Every structure is written in C-alpha cells, then in structure tokens.
Amino acid sequence: ELRRNKKVSKKESSLTVNETDELINNLTRAVTSLSATQTGAIITIEKTDDLSLIMQKSGTPINAPLSPELLLTIFYKGTPLHDGATIIRGNMIIYSAVFYQPTQKPLSGKYGSRHRAAIGISEVCDSLTIVVSEESGKVSLTYKGELIPVPVSEFTTKFKEYYYKK
C-alpha cells in the first residue's frame, strides 16, 4: 500500500474560496466538453495527500495553470499525453501521462482501464478523480475506493460534495 511505503505524504490545501470556485468552473467546463465529444480522460485532484512520488515514477511534468483548453489538448486522442492520468494540485496541472496501479476489486465488464486506475488511486489516497469514458462519454468520480456515476448536469454539485469531504 502506498501509505505504508511512504509514497504519499500529507499537505494542507492553500486555495482561497475564489481559487476553489475557479478550479471547479474550469473542471466543469472541461468535463462537459470531454463528455460531449466522448474523449476519454482521467483527472486527479490532489487533496491533502501529496502524490509526487507516484507522478515521478511514470508521468510527464506540465506545471501550467489549469484551463479547460489545456485539459482538452492533453486528452485529445493521439497526443503523447492522452493516456494515463493528469494530476492537478491547487489550480495547476502538474503532471500528465501518469499511470496508476489499477484496483484489484472485481468490476463489471463495462469498466475499462481508466476506471480501474481511478479506483486504484482512490484506494490509497484522499484524492478525488474524474473519469470520462471514451466509449460512452459518461462521467464518474472516484473517492476512497468508490466509483460514483455522475450525470454531466450534476457534475458541479457532486464534485463539490466529494471535494469538501474529509
């Protein structure tokens, strides 16, 4: 497990209310577009657990301000960064093309590698991960080992609910 191996450490959130609103607005715009175009994506938002050691194993540093346009570009099919997860810290995209250990839990056949990876990371840290299915455009959140299907119209509300959970 990551915590036992000290690959995840704790940190405090430093976002103001306005910055948090900006984060949520940018993610909502990106997820709405990714879903509409059935562009597969896995986006992890760090909460208090620092994912640096995981990123450094497989990811590509980005270190750019979060914007819907940049997320859409990263996940555009065929680009070198579109496979794997993108990790957001605060309002910055810090890494892309990060590969997570998938969950070992049995899932029904309708879930692919993105969903398994998103559940896997949520089992070992407190991050909140957004998954957009390439096949259906459906959106899910993963948090603490749970996969939560979310209609796009309810994304902002559901995201806030899990983002603010302790």
Segments and roles (model prediction):
Residues 2-166:
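Divalent-cation
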